[in-house]
Amino acid sequence: MIAMPFILVIAIILQRRHNRKRAQGGVFVSHRSEYANMEPSPADVAPVAARYGIMPDARGWMGWRCVTHDAGGMGDNIRGVAATVDLNGLAAYGLVRGVPGSGLEDSSFTADQIGAGIWGESLLARAIMAGRPRVLSWWSLYGFDECLRLSDSDIDCVLVGIRPDGRPVAWFVDAKRYKGGSDTCYVNVDAWHLARVSRARRAFVLDSEGRAWTSMSPNMWEQRERWQGLLARYGVVSYWVVCVTPPGGHGTPDMTTAVWPGGVTCMDIPSLRAMVDSVCVPDMFAAIPPGLVSLLDSHIKY
């Protein structure tokens, strides 16, 4: 009874040493988890149901009431602003580099998911780069695998500007276009799953496959670790975020409390744009290190 815990402790210590040696040797650890593709447990779902006042229903998901659609919600002006932006014109000035959504056709997603992804990334690009952008933007980039080779585990967007102290600052963004209007919120059930909730209808919302939950990928967590050394060469201050885009005319689902694996936080488009504008100095593109520009250019999917 005493030996087993001791053995487990030793095993954990050895594994951590092994992981550190792999990282020091340029090989990074994968954070993938089989649990992400499994249904969350009833014990983790129950507190979410209680928090949002979801009514019990024996026919629903894990004994809780479910609906197929939320109550809609108020629209926003994001799509209206985005419609005025000419990405080709911005690309001609070097402000937009790469094509939003490029490479999704080669992914394992369904045709509907690919179409939604391209639409969402294009909307994000136009909304973020509207007006007088303070950043250069890169779209649809290759990420790194465990051995720092180019990988299809991609990065949807990178925004780069200059802070008042002269340091380059970058946002690495994973765009998400999820079901629901502003009535819907996505809330962590655990570290790997989000539940979809209609606040007005006090119910979980089912997707087209009849699921009230969605799993989260550790890709941004992994990419953050793998890019760290390269970004340090150029003194880059980096932020790694998930950005949710409105799927239709009823506003954007609320994902502001959602946290992805590795502590990657989520924000909507107006919040991201406001953060960029508050951090970056305008008209400082020439101060962005040329080596950093070349590095990001080399990762663009064409």
What positions do the PLM features span?
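Surface-exposed interaction regions that form or flank ligand-binding interfaces
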Residues: 1-153, 160-170, 176-302
